[in-house]
Amino acid sequence: MKIIAFLGSPRKEGNTELLLKETIRGIKDSGFSVQIFNLNSMNIQPCQDCGGCDDTGECIYHDDMDVIYNAIRNTDRIILATPIFFFSVSAQTKLMIDRCQCFWCEKYLLKKPLQPGELGRKGLLLLVGGMKKDIGVQCSEACATAFFRTISIQEHSTLSFLGI
């Protein structure tokens, strides 16, 4: 089983990273490996909404997203770990999600959705927030759900840790 994880926190060794590491430790204890993408340290340009991916499903800009695109295409499980900033996912996480517009075009315009593979594609959303209110979870969940559906993940779980 292929598993990838996106770390969307700008804080090195922050709460989001610590929780992701614990999650990955459990996965490794089960005999699987995880490819981690630290979004804060990657060279990812923002989506320009240029329409360049409309006809091909491929982004015309080439940066570290090229590696992410390949990983998303070939994975069975995706972990999206992000702090909650201003009631949503972090800027680093949103930047990566926005650049997945090419998958949206591929799925909805070109009618070529990513295939679920033998194991099916599943996701996990890990959220960490300082506030104790659920509004940040709800807004982050909406963003993550749109992302997961775009990349053919129909089933995902959410773990949220608030007030830390």
Question: Which residues does each predicted region cover?
Answer:
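Glycine-rich phosphate/pyrophosphate-binding loop and the adjoining helix
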Residues: 1, 24, 29-30, 134-164
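Short, histidine-centered active-site or binding-site loop motifs used for metal coordination
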Residues: 7, 127-130, 162-163
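Short, glycine-/small-residue-rich phosphate/pyrophosphate-handling segment
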Residues: 108-154
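N-terminal beta1-alpha1-beta2 submodule of the flavodoxin-like/Rossmannoid cofactor-binding fold
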Residues: 1-105, 110-113, 159
